[in-house]
Amino acid sequence: MASQGTKRSYEQMETDGERQNATEIRASVGKMIDGIGRFYIQMCTELKLSDYEGRLIQNSLTIERMVLSAFDERRNRYLEEHPSAGKDPKKTGGPIYKRVDGKWMRELVLYDKEEIRRIWRQANNGDDATRGLTHMMIWHSNLNDTTYQRTRALVRTGMDPRMCSLMQGSTLPRRSGAAGAAVKGVGTMVMELIRMIKRGINDRNFWRGENGRKTRGAYERMCNILKGKFQTAAQRAMMDQVRESRNPGNAEIEDLIFLARSALILRGSVAHKSCLPACVYGPAVASGYNFEKEGYSLVGIDPFKLLQNSQVYSLIRPNENPAHKSQLVWMACNSAAFEDLRLLSFIRGTKVSPRGKLSTRGVQIASNENMDTMESSTLELRSRYWAIRTRSGGNTNQQRASAGQISVQPAFSVQRNLPFDKSTIMAAFTGNTEGRTSDMRAEIIRMMEGAKPEEVSFRGRGVFELSDEKATNPIVPSFDMSNEGSYFFGDNAEEYDN
C-alpha cells in the first residue's frame, strides 16, 4: 500500500507512537499484557475465586468491565452531575459466578471505583496504563462483532444490513484512542460521521460557538481517520470533500453511504489484533511467565501459542452447544468476525459455521436468567495453524456470496480470493453520479466494475504450523470455491443494542 511508510504500525499506536524497533515493541506490548494479568490475579484474590472460577469467561468479563467503568472519566463525571436513583456513581460491580454445592450461583459484587483504580495502577507499576484498558475494550468489541449483527444500527443510519462486514469495532467507546481507531471498520467510521451530521441537521447550535469548534475538530479528525483507511485516490478525494464541507448535511451523508458501499469491493485498511480475555493473561502470569521479558505481539504467533496452552471455561445454557460457544469465542479472540469462513475452518482445523447455524447466544448471562439449569464447559480455543493478522483490505475480487453478508473484511494475511457479491453490490450504484463528487464517483464505480473474480489477494502468503514460530514455511490453503464464505449468512444473530 502506497502510504504504508507514513502510517504508524499499530504496535506503535499501542505504545504512544514512539518509533521503536521490533524488540522494544514486543517488550512494550508484553508489559501491557503483564499488567492486565497481574490485575486479574489480584481481583481473583479479592473476590476469593477458585482457580476454576477465575478461568470462567463470564467472571473475566465482569472484572474487565469493572475496571473499564472505574476509568471512564466522562461517564463518571456525568453520573456525579446527574445522580439517578439506585446508582452510586462512586461504585462499580457486576455478577460474579461461583460454584456452590455442585451448582453455579450468581453473586452481585460492588466495589469503590477508587479501590479498583488503585488495584489496576498497582498492577501496572503505578501507571494508568490506558493501553491495557484499550486492549480490553478491543476484546469486548471483537466479542460483540462475533456475537451480534448490527442490522438495526445500519438501517438507522441509512445503510444496508448486508454491509455488516464493514462494521468492525462498532461498539468501541469513543475514548479508545489511536489503537481503537485502527481497528474500526469503514462502516463504523461512516456511521459515527452520519450520526454527527444528523445531529448537526437537527440542532442549529451543534457546529456553533466554543463547543461547535471542538465538534468541528472532532468531525475533521474522524474524516481523516476514515480517509486513511481508503486505499484509492478517488475514495480519499471524496473524503476530502466531506471533511471540507462548510455545513455538513444530506449531501455528505449520501457521499459517505456511497463510500461505504464502495468499500465492499475497494476494501479499506482495517487493523486486526488478537485481544484475549483477562482470564487468559492472569493464569499465564501466575504460572511465572514474563510477557515483558519474552516479548509479545498481538498480530503474530503469540496469541495462538497462548491459547494452545490456556484453559478457559464458560457457563452454558441448557439448549446451547458448547462447541458453538467455543467457535464464537475463538473468532472473537482472533478478531475474525468478518473473515472468510473457509479460511477460518482451515486455520482452526475444525469447521467454522455461519452465525445463524450456531446454537448459542451471547457469552454474557442476563441478570434474570435462571442459574439452576446452568452448566459449564471448557472452551476449545486451540488452532491447527497460525497466520499473521492483516491491516490491509487485500485487493479485490469477486465470488458468489450470501444473502446475509455480501463481502468480507480479511483478518489474516493468507493467499485466497476474497468473496463478494458483485451484482448485488453494483445494483446499489444506479445512476446517481451527478453533483460535486460526480467525477470521483464515476472513477470509483469504474474501479469496482474492473474488479476481477480470479484475482488473488495476499499472494504468496500462507498459514504456518504452530511449530514454525519464525514463519519460514508458508502453507497456502486450497478451498472449495463453491462453498459459502460469510459468517452472517441468512442472519439469525441477535441484535446488539445498548
From Swiss-Prot:
The UniProt record lists the keyword RNA-binding: yes
Coiled-coil positions: none
Post-translational modification (record): Late in virus-infected cells, may be cleaved from a 56-kDa protein to a 53-kDa protein by a cellular caspase. This cleavage might be a marker for the onset of apoptosis in infected cells or have a specific function in virus host interaction.
Record's protein name: Nucleoprotein
Main location: virion
Protein role: Encapsidates the negative strand viral RNA, protecting it from nucleases. The encapsidated genomic RNA is termed the ribonucleoprotein (RNP) and serves as template for transcription and replication. The RNP needs to be localized in the host nucleus to start an infectious cycle, but is too large to diffuse through the nuclear pore complex. NP comprises at least 2 nuclear localization signals that are responsible for the active RNP import into the nucleus through cellular importin alpha/beta pathway.
Family annotation (InterPro entries): Flu_NP (IPR002141)
Keywords associated with the record: Capsid protein, Helical capsid protein, Host nucleus, Host-virus interaction, Ribonucleoprotein, RNA-binding, Viral nucleoprotein, Viral penetration into host nucleus, Virion, Virus entry into host cell
Sequence motif Unconventional nuclear localization signal, residues: 1-18
Secretion signal span: none
Region (Disordered): 1-21
Motif (Bipartite nuclear localization signal): 198-216
HAMAP family to which the protein is assigned, alphabetical: INFV_NCAP (MF_04070)
